[in-house]
Amino acid sequence: MTGKKRSASSSRWLQEHFSDKYVQQAQKKGLRSRAWFKLDEIQQSDKLFKPGMTVVDLGAAPGGWSQYVVTQIGGKGRIIACDLLPMDPIVGVDFLQGDFRDELVMKALLERVGDSKVQVVMSDMAPNMSGTPAVDIPRAMYLVELALEMCRDVLAPGGSFVVKVFQGEGFDEYLREIRSLFTKVKVRKPDSSRARSREVYIVATGRK
């Protein structure tokens, strides 16, 4: 892509971003990101979070999802969050900065969870996008497979999993894998998710 084309594309993205009603609402409310609204929509339909729960947040930065969940689980709840990027502190959130794909980071995350099981694992992870689906989709699928492995390790029976997935090669197989592990599985496309985006959210409840 030439610099001129890239500049035009970036300008269009910025224009779309700042005219987005959810971006504007997030700024007015002092929220960390528009992702807050996506999780709010999912919570309204699926009732994943309750006071006192322990929740794992993968791909947490800048903190929109953790910021939302804190309001749902209260002071007795706990969030263990992880991201490659830094994240400003949130009261009630135990944040680990590191690459989730790294075995040592995964080990450190499991140590923070401890022996007790968690009630919800949520993943908003995504790779750095190149714009080429043949490259981006496999990278994204690798991350969501790791998130599902995390569920196998730490999620309590009856627990829930919400994960951002990009539709493309491997999506149907991944959905089948989740259906084998949970009693109820829904695919959600929140209104606050941009229409042109390939992203959807798989909401799985009732860990078998």
Swiss-Prot record:
Protein's gene: rlmE
Enzyme category, top tier: transferase
Highest taxon of the lineage: Bacteria
Record-linked NCBIfam families: PRK11188.1 (NF008390), rrmJ (TIGR00438)
Keywords from the named record: Cytoplasm, Methyltransferase, rRNA processing, S-adenosyl-L-methionine, Transferase
Record's protein name: Ribosomal RNA large subunit methyltransferase E
Function per UniProt: Specifically methylates the uridine in position 2552 of 23S rRNA at the 2'-O position of the ribose in the fully assembled 50S ribosomal subunit.
Record organism: Salmonella typhimurium (strain LT2 / SGSC1412 / ATCC 700720)
Catalytic activity as recorded in UniProt: uridine(2552) in 23S rRNA + S-adenosyl-L-methionine = 2'-O-methyluridine(2552) in 23S rRNA + S-adenosyl-L-homocysteine + H(+)
CDD domains (alphabetical): AdoMet_MTases (cd02440)
